[in-house]
Amino acid sequence: MNLIRIELRKMKMGWYIRGALIANVIIMGFMWLISYSEKADGGVSFQSTDEAFLIIGTFVRAVFIVFGAVLIVKLVISEYKNKTILVMFTYPISRKKLLTAKLMIAGGLTFITILLSNILIAAGFFWLNSICHFIPGELTSEIISQQAVKMAVFAFGAAGTSLVPIFFGMRRHSVPATIISSVVIVMLISSTSPGFSISSVVYIPLSLAAFGLFFSYMAIRNADKQDA
């Protein structure tokens, strides 16, 4: 835990918090814009509350999987690339423990941010829906409890998925490879059609999360062999 606190202090979280808030505002604004424009044309933006939750979740996970890759770049890849991690390797701390702390920060922040963003954007959207009635039907306590469980499960899956780019980034300590691989992953899992998203099939994000955890384990295991 001390290592995690040190890394968080060193990283300076301001940029991440600002970026997350801006992303939340943009996603919420986009959801409102879609709903308003469809209603103005006499149509319905979402057929049900489930579909609205699906679209919100897809947007949030897509954005913050890429944010997760940026965290990996700042915490791991760029430090290897710029040789600054050599300084930390001189400390009486295991390389494996150091890398574990960094990846726990990346995965943990991604999980928390996705979960909170889902809650915030859904709350804002359905508050507006209660006034403007974009979506037919009511938001019941049963729907809310079901969606809360889904949010937690998919946030975990997305957090694990956000670690997959470390496999590509650590090969040559490449920042572009890390970011581009996260974008490709998002493109592959975020394709949607009315009422369906590939990423909404729980086995897909959980399988990718397993890959992310495995690649993280491999990076940690090879930390002592990895030249900075």
Swiss-Prot record:
GO cellular component: plasma membrane
Pfam families, A to Z: ABC2_membrane_4
Topology of this chain in the membrane: Multi-pass membrane protein
Keywords assigned by UniProt, alphabetized: Cell membrane, Membrane, Transmembrane, Transmembrane helix
Compartment list: Cell membrane
Keyword Cell inner membrane assigned: no
Transmembrane segments: 14-34, 53-73, 108-128, 148-168, 178-198, 200-220
Signal sequence residues: none
Protein name from the UniProt record: Uncharacterized protein YcbO
Organism listed in the record: Bacillus subtilis (strain 168)
Lineage: Bacteria, Bacillati, Bacillota, Bacilli, Bacillales
Gene: ycbO
